[in-house]
């Protein structure tokens, strides 16, 4: 997915950042450079920043694809890069769930409650809140199902893009009580 999304760009480097030698070896076997990062890093964003800082000339943008979310909607990576290039400091795509996908997410959460992240958005599309709970609560769901093909639930796809300085600021912040 990542290779296809950047195939026409010579200004983008694809690098796997991991603290697991097996993952690094697999990436290298697949022809992708890999860098080892400190296992004490708590987040993928921290790992992505550590990898970016290994390069003599730091990148303008850093994109972090969660290792547990390798399958992305077509165009997601390109959209993140386009948002960053047009001035966004942070870009992270979400997709509107149709009712069947929402039902599947609900079923999956019965077995794995902390999997999958949903997003509540402002009318302008800006993310207001991310949650492991399915948000928003849906009133009069039967009526909505009958009239709308899409549910009001947006799912985060596990892709984060940052201007390098925005990522530095983000990683300098301590986790909040709600993140723990």
Give the residues covered by each predicted segment:
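N-terminal glycine-rich phosphate-binding loop and ensuing alpha1 helix
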Residues: 1-18
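Short, high-confidence coil segments that cap the C-terminus of an alpha-helix
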Residues: 11, 57-59, 86-90
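Hydrophobic/aromatic residues located in beta-strands of well-ordered beta-sheets
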Residues: 14-16, 62, 127
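Short secondary-structure boundary/capping elements
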Residues: 16-19, 43, 180
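Short phosphate-binding loop-to-helix
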Residues: 21-82
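Conserved core of the sugar-phosphate nucleotidyltransferase
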Residues: 72-173
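Donor nucleotide-sugar recognition loop
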Residues: 174-180
């Amino acid at each position: 997915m990542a290779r296809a999304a950047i195939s026409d760009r010579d200004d983008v480097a694809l690098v796997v950042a991991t603290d697991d030698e097996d993952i690094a070896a697999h990436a290298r076997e697949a022809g992708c450079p890999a860098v080892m990062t400190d296992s004490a890093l708590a987040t993928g964003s921290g790992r992505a920043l550590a990898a970016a800082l290994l390069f003599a000339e730091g990148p303008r943008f850093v994109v972090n694809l969660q290792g547990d979310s390798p399958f992305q909607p077509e165009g997601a990576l390109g959209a993140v890069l386009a948002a960053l290039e047009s001035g966004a400091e942070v870009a992270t795509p979400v997709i509107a769930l149709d009712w069947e996908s929402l039902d599947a997410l609900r079923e999956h959460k019965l077995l794995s409650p902390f999997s999958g992240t949903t997003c509540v958005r402002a009318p302008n599309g800006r993310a207001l809140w991310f949650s492991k709970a399915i948000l928003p609560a849906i009133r009069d769901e039967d009526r909505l199902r009958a009239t709308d093909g899409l549910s009001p639930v947006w799912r985060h796809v596990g892709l984060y893009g940052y201007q390098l300085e925005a990522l530095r600021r983000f990683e300098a912040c301590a986790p909040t009580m709600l993140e723990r």
